[in-house]
């Protein structure tokens, strides 16, 4: 039996933003907004490039992420069960 790894929507979203160099606005829970491009991410953090400065942002501090242009998903990238 082959196990199919189900992709996480959050990972797909951030990876598409990173690969396509789409600028995003990160809204933090304290009200601050950060605009930049995703350089990398893991389960707990996002690295954002803001004006040639890298910022390590903890995901628990993020309220919302808004892309400056739509991020497209392939039909088979995310499936709900």
Curated annotation (Swiss-Prot):
Sample GO molecular function, one term: RNA binding
Domain Sm residues, every copy: 11-71
Ribonucleoprotein recorded as keyword: no
Pfam family, one: Hfq
GO biological process, one term: regulation of DNA-templated transcription
Keywords: RNA-binding, Stress response
Homology family: Belongs to the Hfq family.
Job of this protein: RNA chaperone that binds small regulatory RNA (sRNAs) and mRNAs to facilitate mRNA translational regulation in response to envelope stress, environmental stress and changes in metabolite concentrations. Also binds with high specificity to tRNAs.
Subunit annotation: Homohexamer.
Protein name: RNA-binding protein Hfq
The organism of origin for this protein: Clostridium beijerinckii (strain ATCC 51743 / NCIMB 8052)
Originating gene: hfq
């Amino acid at each position: 039996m082959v196990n199919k790894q189900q992709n996480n929507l959050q990972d797909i979203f951030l990876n598409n933003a990173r690969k396509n160099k789409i600028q995003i606005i990160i809204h933090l829970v304290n009200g601050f907004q950060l605009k930049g491009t995703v350089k990398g991410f893991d389960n707990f953090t996002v690295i954002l490039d803001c004006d040639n400065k890298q910022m390590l942002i903890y995901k628990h501090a993020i309220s919302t992420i808004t892309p400056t242009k739509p991020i497209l998903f392939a039909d088979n990238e995310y499936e709900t069960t």
